[in-house]
């Protein structure tokens, strides 16, 4: 039992770090127009613009006030495409658990509407849950674990959604119906520290939010993502309430 508790604590420790793309590629500039950087003097998490007023991120990225940076590609350079908008509300899912990182989803209301343009566009919420085998793109400014990849420039990675059995075998007893795994069981490609809260987009829909995992790109330990499709009712009702 002690060892199990230790394993869960390690998982929580990884999950509360800011998650980065390993084994990916630099995104084509402004191809992920929904991607945002959450900033509190530094980039600490990603997020996804879902309409001009709201951003979806991970609940474990919660801070009471954040600056949302939109239209970014290189977060260390002023490129002229950026919009910096402070939050007016930050709302974690009411059933979020920091113990097992369950229901790891959060809404951020912008203090003013984002200006939609070539560099800033929302991503659609899912119309249904994507099946195993669906190819998706995860993106972020996290730790690339590479001496050559520039993590200041948005990194992308194409990953498949894994089956529940593969996911549960990787993390026995830890996967809830609010989570899914995506990536490669052989390792080498994954989201990692600095990507947390960022998007997993499949066929133009936001299916996942970068949530947790053991290490980065480790064999047998794929990335774990919040399953956005089961939160549609909460997302739409919460956005309508504020």
Curated annotation (Swiss-Prot):
Say yes or no: keyword RNA-binding present.
no
Protein name as catalogued: Trypsin-1
EC number(s) per UniProt?
A: 3.4.21.4
Domain named Peptidase S1: residues: 21-240
Naturally occurring in which organism (per UniProt): Salmo salar
One Gene Ontology term, aspect cellular component: extracellular space
* PROSITE patterns to which the protein is assigned, alphabetical: TRYPSIN_DOM, TRYPSIN_HIS, TRYPSIN_SER
Its annotated compartments are: Secreted, Extracellular space
């Amino acid at each position: 039992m002690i060892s199990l508790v230790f394993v869960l604590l390690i998982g929580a420790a990884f999950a509360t770090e800011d998650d980065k793309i390993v084994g990916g590629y630099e995104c084509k500039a402004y191809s992920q127009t929904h991607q945002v950087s959450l900033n509190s003097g530094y980039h600490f998490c990603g997020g996804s613009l879902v309409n001009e007023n709201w951003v979806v991120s991970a609940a474990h990225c919660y801070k009471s006030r954040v600056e949302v940076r939109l239209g970014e590609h290189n977060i260390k350079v002023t490129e002229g495409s950026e919009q910096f908008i402070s939050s007016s509300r930050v709302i974690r899912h009411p059933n979020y658990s920091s113990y097992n990182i369950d229901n790891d989803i959060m809404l951020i209301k912008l203090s003013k509407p984002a200006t939609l343009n070539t560099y800033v566009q929302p991503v659609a919420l899912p119309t249904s849950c994507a099946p195993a085998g669906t190819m998706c793109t995860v993106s972020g400014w996290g730790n690339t674990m590479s001496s050559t990849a520039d993590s200041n420039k948005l990194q992308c990675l194409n990953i498949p959604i894994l089956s529940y059995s593969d996911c549960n075998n990787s993390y026995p007893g830890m996967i809830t119906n609010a989570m899914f795994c995506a990536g490669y069981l052989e390792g080498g490609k994954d989201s990692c520290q600095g990507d947390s809260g960022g998007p997993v987009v499949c066929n133009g829909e936001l299916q996942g939010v970068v949530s947790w995992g053991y290490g980065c790109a480790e064999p047998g330990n794929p990335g774990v993502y919040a399953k956005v499709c089961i939160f549609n009712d909460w997302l739409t009702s919460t956005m309508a309430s504020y």
